């Protein structure tokens, strides 16, 4: 694992560390991780290039004069043997899915770091990024108790985010958060049993079933 750590001062703000150093120290910023990924892919005879983006400007960057100051992030562009284009952000964690459907943020435009390149790549995100919630109420009568079953399906980046939350939250705290959410809408809500989590990593889908 190469941790994402940026030391944004001095020459380190612009110059990458050698890939061997990044691999040995096990950390690096966005440009360090991107260059390392590019070199590793090149060793496998896969065409790859570092690419500069701006995480917030989107298409506004097309209207600005050329300047390195307008880029705040570095990612990777990959060209496979069939000339298909793919984009990867090595700084993202807890990602699942295959290399063909790995989530890539909607940066919209990116500039490949290559002296022969003079125009932007147009980037179209292929991620679904949805949350589907299915709630099933079982009401015996209007005065008695009722039960609620909930199935929430997270896809693409939403699955990545929830995977990160689950990994970095104590189990008891996570269960309490789920229960407290529905306590905002229903009185005397109690979880009947622990939630069931299904992580379908091949398609980057995470399902939480609550009872």
Locate each region found by the language model:
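A sensor for short, sequence-defined functional sites
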Residues: 1-211
């Amino acid at each position: 694992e190469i941790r994402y750590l940026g030391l944004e001062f001095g020459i380190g703000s612009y110059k990458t560390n050698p890939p061997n150093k990044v691999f040995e120290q096990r950390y690096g910023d966005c440009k360090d991780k991107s260059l390392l990924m590019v070199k590793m892919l090149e060793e496998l005879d896969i065409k790859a290039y570092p690419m500069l983006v701006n995480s917030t400007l989107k298409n506004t960057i097309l209207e600005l004069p050329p300047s390195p100051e307008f880029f705040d992030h570095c990612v990777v562009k990959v060209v496979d043997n069939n000339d298909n284009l793919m984009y990867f952000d090595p700084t993202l964690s807890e990602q699942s899915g295959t290399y063909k459907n790995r989530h890539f943020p909607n940066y919209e435009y990116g500039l490949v770091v290559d002296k022969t390149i003079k125009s932007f790549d147009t980037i179209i995100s292929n991620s679904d990024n949805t949350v589907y919630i299915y709630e099933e109420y079982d009401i015996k009568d209007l005065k008695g108790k009722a039960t609620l079953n909930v199935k929430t399906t997270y896809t693409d980046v939403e699955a990545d985010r929830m995977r990160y939350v689950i990994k970095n939250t104590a189990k008891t705290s996570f269960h309490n958060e789920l229960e407290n959410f529905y306590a905002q809408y229903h009185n005397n809500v109690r979880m009947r049993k622990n939630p069931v989590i299904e992580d379908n990593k091949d398609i980057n889908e995470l399902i939480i079933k609550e009872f």
